[in-house]
Amino acid sequence: MAVELGFIVEGHCEYESIPSIVSKIHGYFNFPIINAKGIGNIIKNTSDELLHLVKHFDPRKIIISLDYREAEREGLVKDCVELKEIVLRNCEQFMQTQQNGSLELPDEICVIIADKTYESWICADYENLKTNPLFNAAKITENFTNVDEEIPNPCSWLQSKLNEDIDMKARANRKKVAQTLRPDFAATKSRSFRKFHKEVTNINVA
């Protein structure tokens, strides 16, 4: 049976966190989500990831969520625009290749680039991070208009606001941090998250 939405995400952080974020938007999360395990894999194997998702889950809409910092670091792209163009082109090729086949193809494929990394989206609800026991609220003194532009290194910013001896690489801690995010607030403080929020919200649930 077809589902209204499916996700392909870049790595473990997104795979573990996006269900929590989306469930706050829709009140539930029963959508398929694929961990592509690296930006290089998404760029090289977009068609394979799409084929798996379409073949097994038949989503009407697919959201591919990426960040460009790692792709830039690996020399795969020069900026987020190029990354989005490459992946969209791969998506178009997949649709063209499969259009005469037996698969029920999605109505829409959206590529959302987190600027600069997925952690930018976590930073976007800096106010609610103050209530998270992993963080030292006294260290979070800033007010932001657009964290995408105003926080150059989101991972370092988050690390600098933690309580002592907190390991952000621990899976349980990553989940706790993601659960803090309020989508409606984050959408006002991150332009890239606002795009994600819009695409997640704009689905046909009929």
Q: What annotation goes with each model-predicted range?
A:
Residues 2, 15-35, 47-57, 61, ...:
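C-terminal accessory helical subdomains adjacent to catalytic cores in phosphodiester-
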Residues 4-8:
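Conserved beta-strand elements of the Class I
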Residues 43-44:
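A conditional alpha-helix N-cap/helix-loop micro-motif detector
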Residues 37-39:
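Conserved helicase motor
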Residues 9, 66-68:
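Short glycine-centered, acidic/aromatic-flanked micro-motifs in structured strand/loop junctions
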